[in-house]
Amino acid sequence: MISGLLVHRKRCPLVLCAAIVVGWSSAHAQTAPESPAQHLSPLEESTARAVDTHLADNLRLLEQIININSGTMHLPGVIAVKDVLAPRFQSLGFSVRWVPMQSQTQRAGDLIAEHPCPDGGGKCGNRILLIGHMDTVFEPQSPFQKFSIVPGTDGKVATGPGISDMKGGLIVMLAALGAMREAGALEHAEIRIVLSGDEERTGQPLELARKDMIDAARNSDVALEFEPGSRIGGNDTVSIGRRSSTTWHLETTGLSGHSSQIFGPRLGYGAIYEMVRILDAFRRELPQDGLTFSPGLVLGGSSAEMNAEATGGTAMGKANVIAANALAGGDIRTVSNQQTEQTESKMRLIVAAHLPQTDAKISFDEGYPAMAATTAGRELMQQWSDVSVALGLGPVAEAGIMTRGAGDIAFVAPYVSGLVGVGLLGEGAHAEGEKGYLDSLAPQAKRNAILMERLTLPLKLRRK
C-alpha cells in the first residue's frame, strides 16, 4: 500500500519552514524544492511544532531510562524500562500489554502496544509497525552506567549505555507519536508497536522469541525500526536492508602421539592442522560480495573445551605431543538468505575433505535472517527523504547494507516494507562511551511523525 501516496501539499512559507527546525544547522537549508511532496501541509507544520514544544521533557525522559540498567540478562532492569514506557503509550491512546518470556526464552519479555483504526482494521491507510528493543549490551557489572553530556558539545552530544542503541530510538518513537496526537493525526492511524527485551542477546528458540513481532507484521504494511541512524560524510542516512548473522561451531579431532610421528601414515596430521586447513580454505574459497565470515575464538591441544557461553575455554597440550582436539567459533554475515544457505553448504564441503587420520564437524546456530533491499523499500525511503526536505533538513541518503549489522526488522521483512535506522543518531554503539546526538532527536521525531501521517491519513485530512 506504499506506492502512490506522495500527494500535493500547500507550499509552506520559507519563514515558517525555517521556524520548524529551531536550532538545526543552517547547512541543511534547502532551496525551494520542486516536488509537491517536499512541502509541509498545515497539519504537518503543527506536528513539527509539537515536537519542539515537548523536546525538553523528552530529553529528560531519555536520561531517566538510560540511567536504568537494562542489560539483556538483567531482567528486572528491562522490566523497569517497560514500566516507564508502558503508561506513556497508554496516555497516547494505545492499548498496552506485557508478554513475559522468562519461562520460555529466559529473557524479560515483549512490550506490545496497539492503536486501532477507528473505522476498522485496514481502513486507515497503511498499517504501521514500529519496532525496537529495551535492552542494551551493558550488564550491571559494566562500569558504563550513567547518562552524561559530552563536554564542549554545547549540550548536543551525550554519552550513556544504550543512548543510541537504542534508548534514544524509544524516545524518538514516543516524541513522534506524541506530536501526532497533539496535532490530531494519531486518532486516524492504525499502529502496532513491539519492543523486545532481548535484541542484543536473543532468547531461544527464535520462533518464540520473535513470535509477537512476526504476528504483528502479518497485520501490517510498513515497518519502521528505531535503531540508531547514522551520519556519513556529514549527511543523515537511512537503510532499507540488513545483513544476516549466523554463528558457527567447528570441532576437529586427530590421533595423539609423539610429535616426531606427525604427518606419518599411522598418526596423520592432528587436530590443529585439520583446523588450520579448514580455516584457511574458508579464507581462500568463500569470499564473495556482501559476505563476511570470521573465526572469533580458537582452542586446541591434547584436550580442548569451550565454556557454555562460547566466549572462552581451556586447552591443554605440549610442544612435543600431536594435538587431539581443536575447537573454533565464529560468525557469518550475508546480504541475502540465499547467500547464507550457499555459504553454509560450501563450508560443509570444505570441512568434509579431511586430512589423513583426522575428523571434523561443523554446526550452525539459528540466527538472524537477512533483509534484502527492495523496490518498495526504496520508494519508502524516498518518501522519508521528501519529508526531510519539506522540513528543511535536506535529503536523506541510503546507507548501504554493508554499514548495518543484523536486526529485528529482518524477521518481519517477508511481510512488510521497512526502514532501518530511524532512531536517534549516534556513534560507538556497544562500546563504553557510546554517544547519541541529542540535536537529532527532534529532526528524527519530525521525520517519523510526518511520514506516518502521510502513510495513514487521507489527503483531505492531511491538508487541514
Please place each PLM-identified region on the residue numbering.
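Short, flexible, mixed-charge acidic loops at enzyme active sites
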Residues: 140-152, 241-244, 308-313
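Alpha-helical metal-binding/catalytic segments enriched in His/Glu/Asp
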Residues: 130, 153-204, 246-252, 261-285, ...
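Acidic/His- and Gly-rich active-site-bordering loop/insert found
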Residues: 31, 35-161, 181-187
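Acidic/histidine-rich catalytic neighborhood of metal-dependent amide-processing enzymes
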Residues: 157, 166-241, 303-310, 462-463
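Bacterial N-terminal signal peptides
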Residues: 13-23
